């Protein structure tokens, strides 16, 4: 286990050595990984750091406004790039290709911002499980295997690449980051794109965004899952009134885990599952069916793609 009191000064010193001069930008998503990296980098290089938040259009409901509020003290720059990401994802159905499309667009947007502020370095919140899954061929991550082969940065700096998620949280508490950040549930780098099986469209995004909001609202505080979310699997036949309806199938996922390397599905009470189904199908008319995924990791991964 990490000892934050030893890790923090070493990480700050390492960043200082890797970025001796010039400016750096960081992909600040508001998740615990990027938030810890931003705080470490700020302590290491001060105002030579420019935190940037990219609104990909693949974010959770209300995400951008929350992040702007929480990090307003850090001179956060927000880039609205939804059109670029949806254009890159148009027609893409393969999960790996989707991740790489998001990763490449992600980097290109950052390169544009880096040129604008003359930044030489990119700081990223890659953690150890990301590297293991990418190197093992399980799935690429937008900040590991999903990166394009040619980048316009002098160097990519990854201050927490040897830490597990629970260790990152310990460091976050030691850095005195807000509780909302320290205990924030993991959210995939490619965002809602990997919670949509098949091509990403505006309609699917609308459905999965609202379904995720309902699932988090119902399960987070009551059951404290390590991760919980909804995914759009495809379409199925349902009934609305007396009429056949062809609508979306939404899968609900809720797991317990220590570090994300293994996970078990939560045994949610039947009445909770029925309530989730009722809310999702009534509040999102385009949904015809709701299912609950009980598969552990392994054999499944936590996310569907």
Curated annotation (Swiss-Prot):
Pathway(s) per entry: Purine metabolism; GMP biosynthesis; GMP from XMP (L-Gln route): step 1/1
Note the SS bond partners.
none
**Keyword Transcription belongs to the record:** no
Q: Which SUPFAM superfamilies match?
A: Adenine nucleotide alpha hydrolases-like (SSF52402), GMP synthetase C-terminal dimerisation domain (SSF54810)
Q: Which Pfam families match?
A: GMP_synt_C, NAD_synthase
Domain GMPS ATP-PPase: from-to ranges: 2-184
Give the top-rank taxon of the lineage listed in the UniProt record for this protein: Archaea
Which EC numbers characterise this protein's activity in its record? 6.3.5.2
What does the function comment of this entry state? Catalyzes the synthesis of GMP from XMP.
Query: How the protein assembles, per its UniProt entry?
Result: Heterodimer composed of a glutamine amidotransferase subunit (A) and a GMP-binding subunit (B).
Q: What is the official name of this protein in its record? A: GMP synthase [glutamine-hydrolyzing] subunit B
| UniProt source species | Methanosarcina acetivorans (strain ATCC 35395 / DSM 2834 / JCM 12185 / C2A)
């Amino acid at each position: 286990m990490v000892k934050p009191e030893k890790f923090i000064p070493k990480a700050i010193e390492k960043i200082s050595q890797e970025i001796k001069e010039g400016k750096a930008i960081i992909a600040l998503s508001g998740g615990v990984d990027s938030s810890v990296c931003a705080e470490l980098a700020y302590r290491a290089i001060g105002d030579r750091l420019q935190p940037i938040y990219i609104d990909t259009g693949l974010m959770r409901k209300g995400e951008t406004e929350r992040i702007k509020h929480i990090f307003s003290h850090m001179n956060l720059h927000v880039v609205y790039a939804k059109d670029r990401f949806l254009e890159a994802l148009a027609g893409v159905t393969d999960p790996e290709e989707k991740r790489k499309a998001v990763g490449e667009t992600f980097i290109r947007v950052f390169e544009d911002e880096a040129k604008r502020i003359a930044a030489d370095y990119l700081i990223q919140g890659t953690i150890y499980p990301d590297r293991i899954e990418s190197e093992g061929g399980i799935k690429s991550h937008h900040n590991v295997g999903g990166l394009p082969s040619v980048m316009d940065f002098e160097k990519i700096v990854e201050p927490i690449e040897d830490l597990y998620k629970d260790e990152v949280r310990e460091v976050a508490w030691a850095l005195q980051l807000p509780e909302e950040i320290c205990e924030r549930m993991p959210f995939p780098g490619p965002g809602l794109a990997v919670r949509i099986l098949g091509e990403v469209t505006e309609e699917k995004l609308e459905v999965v965004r609202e379904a995720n909001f309902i699932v988090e609202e119902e399960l987070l505080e009551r059951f404290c899952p390590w991760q919980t979310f909804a995914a759009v699997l495809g379409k199925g036949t349902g009934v609305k009134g007396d009429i056949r309806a062809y609508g979306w199938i939404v899968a609900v996922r809720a797991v317990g885990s220590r570090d994300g390397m293994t996970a078990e599905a939560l045994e949610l009470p039947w009445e909770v599952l029925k309530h989730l189904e009722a809310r999702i199908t009534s509040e999102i008319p385009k949904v015809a069916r709701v299912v609950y995924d009980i598969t552990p990791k392994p054999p499944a991964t936590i996310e569907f793609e």
